[in-house]
Amino acid sequence: PVQEICLWEPENPHLYEIRTSLWKNGEMIDARVDITGFREAGFRKDGFYLNGKKLRLRGLNRHQSYPYVGYAAPASMQIFDADILKKELGVNAVRTSHYPQSQDFIRRCDEIGLLVFTEFPGWQHIGDEEWKRQAVQNLKEMIVQYRNHPSIILWGVRINESQDDDVFYRETNRVAHELDDTRATGGVRMLKKSHLLEDVYTYNDFLHDGRHPGCNPKRKVTPDMKKPYLISEYNGHMFPTKPFDDEEHRTEHAIRHANVLNAVAQEPDIAGSFGWCMFDYNTHKDFGSGDRICYHGVMDMFRNPKLAAAVYSSQQEDTPVLELSSSMDIGEHPGGNRSGNWMITNADAVRMYKNSKLIKEYHREDSPYRALAHGPIPVNDFIGNAIVENEPMKPKQARLMGQLLNMTAYYGLNNLPAKFYLLALRLMVCYHMKPKDAVALYTRYVGDWGTTSTVYKFEAVRDGKVVKTVIKEPMQQAHLEVKVSAHNLTEGRTYDMAAVRIRALDENGNVLGFFNEPVQFEVKGVLELIGPKTICLQGGMGGTYVKTTGQAGEGILTIENAQTGKICEHFQVAREE
């Protein structure tokens, strides 16, 4: 017997080997080793509990899809995706929408402590009786094959987004509980108040469209308030966002994810939520933008992060995060307005400098997203004390003038609030200022045109130390950043692959969102290229893959762009004996 069991938890995913042998007449005729963990996972009416502790699920949906090869990616790529979810995006859960996914992916979730909601395959359609019998068989096979994975906390036993079918779904729930009475069942639907036969009411909540609240309260969705409730999808098709969309669109995409996360965090009886989705993916003719690509991800197809990815990664504490929603180029904004600029960070504070002059120190309490551990913080001051220090005005007049100019920058001339006009009237009456005076000051302190280049610097501060710095200034030089998932590959039960993620950056490490130049690939040695030899970056991002060919040795991938030059990545390939 196992003594003093170490429980499996996200922060300490302790695993055990279970060795099983089959004996006949004193002779062992078969044996196997399974890896599993010990934990108690359960849903209650007020949320999800792991080992007796309440845990809010914050996850993303994942398709098992890759550029050029579809679902035919080996173990290394499955592992890579799990690592991205946990270590880059900082989520604590994933939904394998809408089918069971690679054992290699789920095994990696076991190893790194990533919680999993998995379900049997299907989407909206329910067929005839023969079809239903096959669906039940699919469910049986899924549970038998996957039930030893401690990361799996919920079985999906309803065809995703299908209509109610009580006879069918009573059977799927019966089978699931018969084969595994330790896990709850759920059933993803887009229907409110539908027939609840599962243990958990799981619902795709697409209420938020930029105007409506981030989510429905539980009472408006589930027919039984005593049963647990979970949001299985949100956003996604409500606001498709391409990497090469303009800055305002990309920012709105990120803020919508923050809106939903914040709304869910304010509802104590919602177990958690899964955003749609982890990355963009190939799709059928009815979706996409005429190119059969769903731009629903917080990452692009190659797993390069969009701005929205930072909303998730900023909720973890292990890695410093600081992303600016803006390049600080006024020409990217209609009318030159700088409204809607955000700092997405997990820092305690962010110091903002303009041409080495401290403008303002922002704190996490300045975020309107009070329910999040680290909500996005609006940039609402471009002036600081500059007018007080540089203009021949009375201190109070200078401060009022600064407020006026910041309001103009934040709201834009066509959306100014009533308090702006009251403030302008006060400056005119009390200090005899004229509109042309304000225009001149705006040009000097906010507009940034006709003067020397403006350099903005943002410092993320944690525990009194600067942990990350972002600099925004007019781009002088572009270069390619290349990130390779692994340089050592192994030809084993299948070919092996390496993901190559590419971004065009300026000299300060900022993504060049409109660098859509061609990039050429050349492979030498024991590797093959997956995909075309030439691509065009989209939104300054792209990628490729290389694969093994059955041979051991060295391989070289050359990446070339006419503007940035060549980069060579070297690989070593071994064969598994």
Spans of model-derived segments:
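Secreted/periplasmic carbohydrate-active enzymes, especially glycoside hydrolases
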Residues: 1-100, 107-108, 113-116, 138, ...
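Substrate-binding/catalytic cleft of secreted carbohydrate-active enzymes
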Residues: 81-87, 93-341, 356, 364-366
